[in-house]
Amino acid sequence: MRAIASNEFCAYFQPQVNTQSNVVGAEALIRWNHPQRGLIAANEFIPIAEQYGFIQKLQNIVLHDICILINELKANAIIDNSFSVSINISQSQFNSSNLKGELFNIINKFDIRASQIKLEITESMLSSDIDYTIRQMKELIAAGFLFSIDDFGTGYSCLAYLSAFPVKELKIDKSFIDKILDSTVGFNIAQTIISLGKSLNLEVVAEGVETTEQYDLLKKMNIDAMQGYLIARPMDKEGYAKWHSANTNAQ
């Protein structure tokens, strides 16, 4: 693919903060810096990458940028080893027998701890082959990686199996966060997910937080962390490093 050879893909980073406004992590998002169209979001090209077998190359680009960023933040004494960056893993990647090897090839190159990489999988992926999913997750967790369930509440996984999956985190989808202020149902769904996460000893992150009213309410609801435009828009690694440094110094 010409765009890969031309280095047009890169990771953008969106910070996650806790209820004390401390930066606790970030999510890495693939972007295509198209020479004519400008910055293109992942939803426009990921299906094509999946179809033509380029998805692993894109993941490696993102992981490469994550490692560079983590090392820069460490070198400037901005983070410690508890800081982690999330990366989205597709169904085909998760099912690949090469996933663990691909991950270690890159993090070993940069001397990054596996525990600083959080693998985000969607809720729907949990229900495809439960036994295989648990085995694959346990193998990667044994190697040090962390797991997060992205867009929780939008899929069809059985809650009875949720405790069997060795995940660290649930992420509440933006579609629910949008409704917490003006919908009793929206509020109750978000509160239920938070309570469920707490009962299973999982961290819960709210995605798509855009207003101070949402932030304040989620804080009262005992959320663990938040991300969204209110905190910061996604930034390239240089922009993120500056943002993180400024916000760490301000704390």
Regions inferred by a protein language model and the residue ranges of each:
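EAL-family c-di-GMP phosphodiesterase catalytic domain
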Residues: 35-36, 90-97, 116-131, 143-251
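Short amphipathic alpha-helical segments
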Residues: 1, 10, 46, 59-67, ...
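Conserved long alpha-helical elements within nucleotide-processing catalytic cores of c-di-GMP signaling
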Residues: 43-47, 56, 134, 138
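Catalytic core of bacterial c-di-GMP phosphodiesterases, primarily the EAL and HD-GYP domains
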Residues: 18, 22-27, 54-132, 208
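Inter-domain helical "communication" segments and dimerization helices
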Residues: 5, 9, 54-55, 67, ...
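Active-site core of bacterial EAL-family cyclic-dinucleotide phosphodiesterase domains
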Residues: 1-48, 88, 149, 227, ...
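Catalytic-core regions built around general acid/base machinery
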Residues: 106-109, 135-143
